[in-house]
A protein has these predicted regions:
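A general secondary-structure junction signal
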Residues: 75, 167, 206-210
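Short, flexible active-site-adjacent loop segments at beta-strand->alpha-helix junctions, enriched
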Residues: 114-116, 169-171, 210
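Alpha/beta catalytic barrel-like cores
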Residues: 1-131, 138, 148, 155, ...
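Acidic/histidine-rich catalytic cores of soluble enzymes
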Residues: 172-238
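Active-site groove signature of glycoside hydrolases
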Residues: 147-177, 202-205
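Generic detector of solvent-exposed, compositionally biased contiguous segments
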Residues: 135-136, 175
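Active-site-proximal beta-alpha core segment in soluble small-molecule metabolic enzymes
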Residues: 141-142
Length: 238
């Protein structure tokens, strides 16, 4: 094995750096607690408090990392100007312009994640799988908005954007109905991916969830669900 050649090839494969590692998944669009069973508290000492601090920290981190990189942004890291605000179902590319400028200046691509947690419209721990139609519709519209934002990222950087669909939907106890939430979840993802996009430039994918705080017994988007959905929808997602 030519190890030098192997290392050189690896150096050319971009690794996507998660912006949310810089502030313990707090984000900039809300002041409430973190939800979704994620294993953080939002209280890490020394975390970035503003977009400027987060970007400066990312610059420092990237200066210490070898190889090609991309920036991975969560929807809750929208940057609003002059007191403006858009809820997650109304997010637009302009709310992420500073991230686009940051990436373009460094010759990097952007990946994206809808944020299906830490929001007052997470009802009974559910979003895309909620039996409440109003709740489910809100989160479907959020997913569609994120497809449009991902398209903008790809257009602006000239680099394909991977859009990762992950939710914390689930229950602390084993539910009587384990099929219903997954049927609704599938229908919701189908509807999100009905939003037009160029599959060469926008690469949707579905990520599974194992378990989390308060979601110990049942997760809707299990590994089996995510793998099966991706296998059955190869033309639409990774």
């Amino acid at each position: 094995v030519d190890t030098d050649a192997a290392i050189e090839k690896c150096m050319q494969v971009p690794v996507s750096l998660h912006c949310w590692q810089g502030d313990d998944v707090t984000g900039f669009d809300h002041d409430g607690p973190l939800t979704g069973g994620i294993q953080t508290t939002g209280n890490y000492p020394g975390k970035a408090r503003t977009p400027e601090e987060l970007m400066a920290d990312m610059d420092k981190a990237m200066s210490l990392m070898p190889g090609a990189k991309k920036i991975n942004v969560h929807a809750c890291y929208a940057i609003f100007e002059d007191g403006e605000f858009a809820d997650r179902d109304k997010l637009e590319p302009k709310h992420f312009q500073k991230w686009v400028d940051f990436a373009k200046k460094r010759g990097m691509g952007l990946d994206f994640n809808p944020t299906f947690f830490s929001h007052e419209k997470v009802k009974d721990g559910l979003t895309l799988s909620s039996p409440d139609e109003e709740t489910r519709k809100f989160w479907i519209e959020h997913g569609k908005a994120c497809i449009r934002i991902s398209k903008y990222f790809a257009e602006q950087t000239g680099i394909p954007c991977v859009m990762n669909i992950w939710t914390g939907d689930g229950f602390k106890d084993v539910p009587a109905d384990r099929m219903g939430p997954r049927v609704r979840y599938k229908e919701s993802i189908d509807e999100i991916l009905s939003e037009p996009y160029d599959p060469k430039m926008v690469k949707p994918c579905v990520e599974s969830k194992v378990f989390g705080i308060g979601v110990e017994a049942y997760t809707v988007g299990s590994a089996e669900f995510a793998l099966s959905y991706a296998a059955m929808n190869k033309e639409k997602c990774l």
